Amino acid sequence: MGAAFHCHAQDNDDFESFRSGLMDGFQSFRQEVLTGYTDFLRTAWEDFNVFRSESRDSKPKPRTAPANHPTPAATPPAPGPAPAVHNNITLDFYGTRLMLPALKVAALRSSDNNGVADFWQALDSQGLGSKTGNALKEIAERHRFNDWMMLKLVETYVSNQLATASADTRIAMRQYLLCHTGYDVRVAQNDGCLALLVPYSTTIYSSSYIDVDGKRFTLVFDAKSGRTTACGSVRTYRLPGERNAGGLIDPVFRQAPRVTESMVSVKLTDKKTSVACNVNANLAKLLYDYPQIPLIEYSRSSLQPSFRKELTSQLRQTTAGMTPEAAVGTMLNLVQHAFKYATDQEQFGFEKPLFPEESAIYGINDCEDRALLFSMLIRQVTGLDCLLVEYPGHVACAVRL
């Protein structure tokens, strides 16, 4: 049985309001949540059952591309790094150079509740939450990072600065910083080590999670620990339900991030249609471990407007004067024949839907990637309504003609 999702142009007003409110209300957030947070950490942690989220689609995809029966017929430059400040470091974040305060912290003495609480107190005594939290938020605002990019920024920053520390120290540090940038990210014990509890705003497929008072938290381990899934139950704390515990991690790119560009020229062609465009290859590095989320969320994201404008403007000229049916057929032919076909397992070794920019960078994709690209072209070139339709082992795009 399939599922259909309506694709439409996104509206960034809600995102801008959310981001502005998040930043403007940070001081009240600290007063409500962070004051006394160590007291909650010191409470007796409870056991929670771990669940495994569903896979997006367990049926294997076809090893060859489905046959096509055709119908007859600008990103702003990334801001430069902030002016040099004493005791700051320069961080390479997927090709974008960022300036952040150097981190000097004592190691976590133990991974139990009191050890984590003591770690928080030591960081608070340095004023680290305000200083570093504000620096991270300023970068996210200036570079238009979404919540998932903030999650990755904190991971990259802590891994760089605490490379020789224990995995538990890095996890505790990441949780502290994410709390101080406005998110309800928590920490838990699992099989002798610490894990982050990340509250996503949408389903994350093929992940371990727990439910705390009706709120789903995805478990995230330190990359150097070798852990990717939970073993047995998880121990963590509760926050009083009436408190503003912080925001969720929204992985959707509501606005295009301002990242350093490493432009490559690509040519997409079939026997009749050819388009040339430039795409930022740095996006492939950034998005390599992007989480598996519902396909409709990919269609709501904006990554590199200049690439999409360049691509769609050429196709708008190519299809000018065509009937809707002929225009749709022309773009379908291009999407089906401009790329080599490979399943995600063959290309990456794991399930990975591609944004249109990634399809252009890799030059290889599968049915779901082509459906995402095709639906974007339909919306932006013709303005026609379309649906992403999911079948077991296959994804298609239905167009209203």
Q: Where are the predicted features?
A:
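Bacterial N-terminal signal peptides
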Residues: M1-A3
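Sec/Tat signal peptide C-region and signal peptidase I cleavage site
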Residues: F5-A9
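N-terminal propeptides/low-complexity segments immediately following signal peptides
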Residues: Q10-D57
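Intrinsically disordered, low-complexity N-terminal segments that are enriched in acidic
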Residues: E46-L268
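Secondary-structure boundary elements
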Residues: M99-A106, N114-E155, L295-Y362
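Active-site neighborhood of thiol-dependent amide/isopeptide-bond enzymes
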Residues: Q161-R174, A342-A396, R400
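Hydrophobic/aromatic-rich core segments of domains that either
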Residues: T181, V185-D213, L311, L315, ...
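The feature marks a conserved, polyanion-engaging helical scaffold used by nucleic-acid processing enzymes
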Residues: C231-A338
